[in-house]
Each structure stands twice: as C-alpha cells, then as structure tokens.
Swiss-Prot record:
It comes from the Bacteria. One of its GO terms (molecular function) is structural constituent of ribosome. This is Small ribosomal subunit protein bS6. Residues 168-191 are annotated as: Disordered. It comes from Mycoplasmoides gallisepticum (strain R(low / passage 15 / clone 2)).
Length: 191
C-alpha cells in the first residue's frame, strides 16, 4: 500500500455532471478505498490536447496498491473523453521522504528560525548585519583599487576602518617596460 496523487483531465465538451460521472466510473476501480477528491474546475488549456481547448480538472488523493492504480491508468487511457492522466507515488517523492526523516525536519526548523530572525532584523532596521561584524565585507577584503576609491569618496578618515595609508597611484594604467632599455641590454650582451 502506497500513497498516490492522481490528476485527471476530462474533456471540456462535457458538462460538469458528465465529467463527474466519468471520474466516478474510474474511481470504482479502487472499491472501498478512502479517496479525497478535489474538483479544480474547468480551465482553458495552454495548447490543444486531442483537438480540445478546455478540460475539467480532478485531483485524487488515496492509499492503494500498485495493481489497482495500474488498472485505473489502463481504463483511463481507453476512454476517449479523458485527455490526460498523471499518477504520482508521493512516497517516492523526495519531499515526502524528507518529511518522515527526523533529522531533516529538525534541520528545516532550525533554518526556518534563522530565516525568520533575518527577516525580522531587515524589517526593523532596513538591512541585515551579521552578528559580531561591524565592517562591510567588501571593505574588509578590499584590494588597493577599492581602498583608493573609498579614500576618494570619504576622504582620509574612513568610517570605522583601519586601512594603511596609500600613496596616490594611477591604478587604472599598468606600467609597461621600456623597450629601448631592453634593446640596449641585448646589444651589450651580444658585444
């Protein structure tokens, strides 16, 4: 016995009572099994299926054996007024298996609590700050070019930072070696 979720799409040319009758005929395969059913309404399809543009959607949730589900699928595929059928074994899905694992549930609760703390801090302060760190991580790991840009922006007194004083250097231009001095050295070596 396994838990299944079945999505059934019945032709939109039928009215709601006829579509419900088709669904009831197919559900008879499961016998006295407890089935939770949701009628999701008649919706327009994104693309035509079997030359139909609308369909009635039904969701079924049940616990059954594989043989009954296979028979349900066989009967649904025979009927011409059933457009599509999707059967999911929810016990094989990772979300269901994770919800049954105590360690994963505890970890998820811990992560959710941390997320709630962060969102609360963002709503109160307008920003999130890691506990124990007053500096911006970009400034903390800043290279020479970034430090120079901060000095231009804030002046010599950077807020709450201890950055060594840099001499004014053009950081955008890379120094190129002087070719004439290299040629002189080669000539001297050859002579």
């Amino acid at each position: 016995m396994a838990k299944y979720e079945i999505m059934l799409m019945v032709s939109g040319q039928l009215n709601q009572n006829q579509a419900q009758a088709v669904n009831d005929e197919l559900k008879a395969v499961f016998g006295k099994t407890e089935i939770t059913e949701e009628y999701l309404g008649q919706k327009t399809l994104e693309y035509p299926i079997k030359k139909e543009v609308t369909a009635h959607y039904f969701n079924l949730f049940l616990t059954s054996d594989g043989k009954s589900v296979h028979e349900y699928k066989r009967l649904a595929s025979i009927r011409t007024d059933v457009l599509r059928i999707l059967i999911l074994n929810t016990e094989k899905e990772f979300g269901y298996r994770a919800s049954q694992n105590a360690k994963k549930v505890a970890l998820a609760k811990q992560k959710q609590a941390r997320y709630n703390d962060i969102m609360k801090q963002v709503q109160e302060n307008g920003y999130f700050q890691i506990k124990g760190s007053k500096r911006n991580s970009r400034v903390e790991k800043a290279g020479a070019k970034e430090v120079w840009m901060l000095r231009e922006k804030f002046g010599e007194d950077l807020p709450e930072q201890k950055i060594p004083v840099l001499r004014k250097v053009n950081l955008t231009r890379k120094p190129t070696p002087n070719k004439s001095s290299e040629n002189k050295q080669k000539v001297e070596k050859q002579a």
